[in-house]
Design a protein with these regions (language model features):
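Active-site-proximal beta-strand/loop segments in catalytic clefts of secreted hydrolases
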Residues: 1, 34, 67, 89-90, ...
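A small/polar active-site loop signature that marks catalytic segments
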Residues: 1-62
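Short, Gly/Ser/Thr-enriched beta-strand-loop segments that form substrate-interacting elements
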Residues: 77-106, 113-116
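Short, well-ordered beta-strand elements
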Residues: 108-134
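Short, gly/Ser/Thr-rich active-site loops of penicillin-recognizing serine hydrolases
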Residues: 134-159
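Active/binding-pocket-proximal capping segment
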Residues: 61-75
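Flexible loop/turn segments at secondary-structure boundaries
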Residues: 38-39, 72-74, 119-122
Length: 159
């Protein structure tokens, strides 16, 4: 249980790692800070799926996620499609990740993890551009559009 105390970043990262290990068992990832967003933080898509599966449909996990609706209005199939899509996103400096849950119209429950990055652009950033990288907004829109296209495709395919 987290106490809310301000702790050193490394101690906080260790607490997060212990918490995750308690949820999914052994893992090969790494937290460099409490948020998991630090440069040294790493986790595989497989480990993220294990976490989602072990937390599956718990209100504590789902309430942290955004709701998404199928948006493609030109398709008659999608116009009448209703489903449950929840996502937790992480987008920063040419890294755009999304993970969450889909419940299809038929009631089938799916888990997904989509990890996307342009590490070449990210690694070329100079320190002064890290808060607002050039072209990052355009890249973020493209990766988000691709992620939502994949989710919508899976929701329909596995209905």
């Amino acid at each position: 249980k987290f106490s809310g105390d301000n702790r050193e970043i490394k101690v906080s990262a260790k607490i997060m790692g212990s918490w995750l290990e308690n949820k999914i068992g052994n893992y090969e990832g790494n937290f460099s800070d409490h948020s998991g967003l630090g440069v040294g933080s790493m986790m595989s898509s497989h480990e993220l799926i294990r976490f989602l599966k072990n937390s599956e449909w718990q209100a504590s996990a789902i309430n942290l996620m955004q709701s998404f609706k199928v948006k493609k209005t030109q398709s008659s199939t999608l116009k009448s499609y209703t489903n449950f899509i929840k996502a937790k996103t992480g987008t920063l400096n040419y890294v755009g990740n999304m993970a969450g849950y889909i419940e299809t119209k038929s009631g089938r429950k799916l888990l997904y993890v989509i990890l996307g990055s342009n590490l070449e652009k990210r690694n070329r950033l100079i320190k002064s551009d890290r808060d607002n990288p050039p072209e990052a907004k355009i890249w973020n829109k493209k990766i988000r559009s691709l992620q939502l296209d994949l989710i919508e495709s899976w929701a329909l395919r596995y209905n």
